[in-house]
From Swiss-Prot:
Nucleotide-binding recorded as keyword: no
Function: Gamma chains make up the fetal hemoglobin F, in combination with alpha chains.
Ranges of residues in domain Globin: 3-147
Name recorded for this polypeptide: Hemoglobin subunit gamma
Organism: Papio cynocephalus (Yellow baboon)
The gene coding this protein: HBG
Length: 147
């Protein structure tokens, strides 16, 4: 996990303040399920995931995506302690849900793509670098309880 500079923190926090958590969360999780279809097996209870349009319109996907990004908001407030912030979620995803930790990295990369789409020119290479560092840190923290 990289160390966050004050500039990284300011960059991440500034953009995060403009993110519509509900929309971006649903789009991020939806894209993950479409682009990496093997991740769908963790969401059997979500109903129809048979096509891209079914996934992107699925209210359970949108609701869980919002939940995921809401917890990411907690991480943004605690960038210096991502491992502590995600200790319980790491345990849940490891011990109970048996999620492949690689999926956390994939989700982070999809989020960066969604932010780039939504923010266009504002999502400069410097902004992307800070966000990539953050999503990598979150993926690492979520993977920390795996053995």
């Amino acid at each position: 996990m990289g160390h966050f500079t004050e500039e990284d923190k300011a960059t991440i926090t500034s953009l995060w303040g403009k993110v519509n958590v509900e929309d971006a969360g649903g789009e991020t999780l939806g894209r993950l399920l479409v682009v990496y279809p093997w991740t769908q097996r963790f969401f059997d209870s979500f109903g129809n995931l048979s096509s891209a349009s079914a996934i992107m319109g699925n209210p359970k996907v949108k609701a869980h995506g919002k939940k995921v990004l809401t917890s990411l908001g907690d991480a943004i407030k605690n960038l210096d302690d991502l491992k502590g912030t995600f200790a319980q979620l790491s345990e849940l995803h490891c011990d109970k849900l048996h999620v492949d930790p690689e999926n956390f990295r994939l989700l982070g990369n999809v989020l960066v793509t969604v932010l780039a789409i939504h923010f266009g020119k504002e999502f400069t290479p410097e902004v992307q670098a800070s966000w990539q560092k953050m999503v990598a840190g979150v993926a690492s923290a979520l993977s920390s309880r795996y053995h």
